[in-house]
């Protein structure tokens, strides 16, 4: 195998696939990237057996062939080597040479026949989406993915294509049982499916698509395939049933307050310094045009903040995890946050006045 390619092109392809590599894997070949040169194209493959990322580029190939090299070593060499045209040459089955000008590097190889490939033959239900929109939907929900492995079905992002009011939408949903994030997109595409995408795959999808324009998505009962420009992600799904998230959405939260997002975030950020109990609890009091936050008891609080708001509904006193609140408010881009309460003991609904995303947060006892 021998080919020449510019550093820029090779580094971009390597950067795309490198995230799939499991650097501490006990199977040596899974720490490697597979390189395959044929038909004037070079294909790169990386996998941890759950996710496979491939990328390809066109270049001048002198000799077709394939091999696998240690991913991080190869990536670091290409990243640090000067700009220019790089020559890649498989000298023998066990040694790959990298040349650019007067620079020479040789790295050991593993037989490509040992490299596993995840099949995508059974994937159907393909839809095309705006990549920037999907990346934003992921950003607004992935923070709520659970790390609790005992409830493995919450360890991923629920991707739900469904019909609502004679229209078709795509929802991204995540919850850890303490908070839930939901983002919605009108697609108009008559496809219905519900899949749980693993957390690592979600991060890789977002990383790869966020600087592109269009993305193609195909799913089956057990896999998802994302195609974006010259990069393809194939991943296994979480085998489980995501809880009926629509039943979590509060229906009777009629005590509504609008707050400046930056003011609320800054107050929470300050007051959370002293919210150091198990739940990082902050008490919220809402009454007579006042939105108050405090840590500690009512008589002698450790920290207290007060914001002026327009509010004349029922008095509300509730407690929330300050970190969870900050995580949610950080996802809101508009100037105002809308918080809807039922009472002090029920979940609160948080949204932006003109957003397609909403958030639910459970109260904590104070």
At which residue positions do the language-model features occur?
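Structural preference for solvent-exposed beta-strand-turn elements
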Residues: 1-366
């Amino acid at each position: 195998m021998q080919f020449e390619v510019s550093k820029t092109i090779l580094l971009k392809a390597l950067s795309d696939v490198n995230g799939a590599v499991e650097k501490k894997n006990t199977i040596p070949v899974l720490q490697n990237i597979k390189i395959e040169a044929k038909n004037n194209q070079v294909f790169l493959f990386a996998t941890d057996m759950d996710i496979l990322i491939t990328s390809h580029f066109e270049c001048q190939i002198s000799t077709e062939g394939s091999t696998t090299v240690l991913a991080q070593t190869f990536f670091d060499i290409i990243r640090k080597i000067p700009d220019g045209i790089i020559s890649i040459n498989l000298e023998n089955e066990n040694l790959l040479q990298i040349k650019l000008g007067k620079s020479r590097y040789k790295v050991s190889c593993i037989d490509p026949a040992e490299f596993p490939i995840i099949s995508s033959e059974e994937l159907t239900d393909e839809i095309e989406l705006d990549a920037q929109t999907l990346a934003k939907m992921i950003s607004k929900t992935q923070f709520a993915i659970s790390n609790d492995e005992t409830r493995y079905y919450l360890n991923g992002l629920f991707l739900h294509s469904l019909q609502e009011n004679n229209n078709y939408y795509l929802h991204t949903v995540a919850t850890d049982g303490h908070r839930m994030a939901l983002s919605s997109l009108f697609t108009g595409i008559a496809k219905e499916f519900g899949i749980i995408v693993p957390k690592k795959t979600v991060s890789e999808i977002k990383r790869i698509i966020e600087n592109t324009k269009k993305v193609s998505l195909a799913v089956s009962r057990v896999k998802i395939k994302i195609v974006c420009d010259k990069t393809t992600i194939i991943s296994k799904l979480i085998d489980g049933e995501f809880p009926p998230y629509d039943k979590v959405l509060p229906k009777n939260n009629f005590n509504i307050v609008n707050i400046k997002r930056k003011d609320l975030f800054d107050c929470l950020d300050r007051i959370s310094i002293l919210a150091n109990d198990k739940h990082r609890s902050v008490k919220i009091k809402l009454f007579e045009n006042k939105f108050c936050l405090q840590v500690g008891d009512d008589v002698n609080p450790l920290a207290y903040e007060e914001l002026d708001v327009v509010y004349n509904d029922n008095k509300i006193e509730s407690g929330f995890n300050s970190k969870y609140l900050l995580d949610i408010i950080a996802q809101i881009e508009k100037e105002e946050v809308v918080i809807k309460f039922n009472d002090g003991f029920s979940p609160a609904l948080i949204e932006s006045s003109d957003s397609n995303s909403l958030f639910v947060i459970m109260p904590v006892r104070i």
